[in-house]
């Protein structure tokens, strides 16, 4: 592997050359985007939730039976956790999109120095560890699966992808709650910017469809409980009647490249990552900082990293999970950073379509943001019908809006006061 020292190089320009996604809407990025722009929803009533036990019966659940199986079959697939399989399939889709794989799904370029910056908060805890624990209690030590400890750990998604494609470069896995996806992409961006790798697969994956996980958020009173008979209207980001979020799941991956590396292989360039930063509220493990100051710090720092002035931002892809406190705190952060312009910058949240995908949320939303730059369309915020005076922003509600966006931000915020912000741009030669 080529040794690189961050202090010995000039910062690199970092571009996006491929995207891949699995969501409750569809098993590909293109289909997910098309459905979101058309106002679709992947939120449904879940089959495994007992109405007597669960006040929220809804989920944005991935169609497990319809998942692609292009890169892993047989015993290897059986011994790989769902979160890792989703990561592999969406990473593979992104690599195909980037022109990195041939017809046999093998790399067409040397990926020895390429790396992975991934994230997940749950890993295989519910899909693998809990069932193994039940087996252990009922049938004893001898019946515990021998492959258990190479299934549920968080870092196995990155390993699965790097092993499949021979990627021997940097490898990291972050778990920063709902900011994870944006932070993983930001970490991949910085790895390339500072010369640690020429190419990174970056994103996050999350499998949340388990009654215990649902129960935990119900106990926190974070989930919407007024829409069990009307799933389409359950998640209402920024709307004055919002009453909690809906759990979602999925995986989103992007191919990030050093611009020179992408040009040398003749890659199609989708967008450019200009900046990234993270911060912490240092306020409360669950509640956001009410005045939005912690989130504003991340946004300001990302703009500084990008050498971009607030006046240059033309669109905001919001976190907005459809909670009363969180959506207002985010709006206050936006007003704090952008001042009088805040009310005229188009803002959208896609959680009304796919729910809150936890670690994968920021990654899937970044992919939609990239498509916004490429296609010139801002996707709608589903169920935005009643403006909240405490929000006071230009929310793109219910219908997609045509807009030629040059530079935008993508925000993600999470439990533990985690904040992350990416600055994304339409690619230009200069």
Question: How does the language model describe each region?
Answer:
Residues 47, 196-243, 276-290, 320-327, ...:
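Acyl-CoA/ACP chain-elongation machinery
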Residues 86-99, 157, 257-259, 292-307, ...:
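Short, well-ordered amphipathic alpha-helical segments that serve as non-catalytic structural scaffolds
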Residues 87-100, 154-157, 162-165, 171-206, ...:
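Active-site-proximal alpha-helical scaffold in enzymes
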Residues 16, 40-176, 205-214, 310-326:
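Conserved beta-ketoacyl condensing-enzyme motif
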Residues 137-145, 186, 190, 194, ...:
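Glycine-/small-residue-rich "gating" segment that lines the acyl/pantetheine channel
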Residues 13-17, 40-45, 230-306, 314-315, ...:
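Condensing-enzyme catalytic core mediating Claisen C-C bond formation in acyl metabolism
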Residues 1-76, 98, 260-272, 367-381, ...:
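ACP-dependent fatty acid/polyketide chain-elongation machinery
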Residues 18, 36, 91, 116, ...:
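Conserved small-residue
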């Amino acid at each position: 592997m080529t040794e690189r020292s961050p202090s010995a190089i000039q910062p690199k320009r970092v571009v996006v050359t491929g995207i891949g996604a699995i969501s409750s809407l569809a098993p590909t990025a293109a289909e997910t985007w098309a459905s979101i722009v058309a106002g679709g929803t992947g939120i449904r009533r879940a089959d495994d939730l007992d109405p007597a036990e669960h006040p929220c019966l809804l989920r944005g659940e991935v169609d497990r039976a319809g998942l692609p199986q292009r890169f892993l079959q047989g015993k290897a697939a059986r011994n790989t956790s769902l979160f890792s399989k989703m990561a592999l399939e969406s990473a593979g889709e992104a690599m195909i999109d980037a022109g990195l794989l041939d017809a046999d799904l093998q790399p067409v370029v040397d990926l020895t120095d390429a790396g992975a910056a991934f994230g997940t908060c749950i890993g295989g805890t519910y899909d693998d560890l809990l069932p193994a624990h039940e087996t252990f209690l009922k049938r004893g030590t001898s019946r515990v699966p021998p492959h258990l400890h190479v299934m549920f750990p968080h870092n196995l998604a990155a390993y699965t992808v790097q092993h499949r494609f021979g990627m021997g470069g940097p490898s990291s896995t972050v778990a920063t709650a709902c900011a994870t996806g944006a932070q993983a992409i930001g970490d991949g961006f910085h790895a390339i910017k500072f010369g640690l790798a020429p190419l990174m697969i970056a994103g996050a994956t999350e499998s949340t469809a388990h009654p215990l996980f649902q129960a935990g958020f119900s106990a926190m009173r974070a989930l919407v409980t007024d829409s069990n008979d009307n799933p389409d209207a359950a998640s209402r980001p920024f709307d004055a009647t919002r009453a909690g979020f809906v759990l979602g799941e999925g995986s989103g991956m992007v191919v990030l490249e050093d611009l020179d590396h992408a040009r040398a292989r003749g890659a199609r360039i989708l967008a450019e990552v200009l900046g990234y930063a993270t911060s912490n509220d240092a306020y409360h493990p669950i509640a956001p900082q009410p005045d939005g100051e912690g989130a504003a710090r991340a946004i300001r720092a990302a703009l500084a990293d990008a050498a971009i002035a607030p006046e240059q931002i033309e669109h905001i892809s919001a976190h907005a999970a459809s909670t009363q406190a969180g959506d207002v705190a985010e709006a206050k952060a936006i007003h704090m950073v952008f001042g009088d312009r805040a009310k005229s910058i188009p803002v959208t949240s896609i959680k009304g379509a796919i729910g809150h995908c936890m670690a994968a949320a920021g990654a899937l939303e970044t992919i939609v943001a990239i498509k916004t730059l490429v296609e010139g369309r801002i996707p709608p915020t589903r169920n935005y019908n009643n403006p909240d005076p405490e929000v006071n922003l230009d929310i793109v509600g219910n219908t997609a809006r045509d807009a030629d966006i040059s530079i935008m931000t993508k925000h993600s915020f999470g439990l533990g006061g985690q904040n992350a912000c990416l600055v994304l741009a339409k690619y230009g030669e200069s």
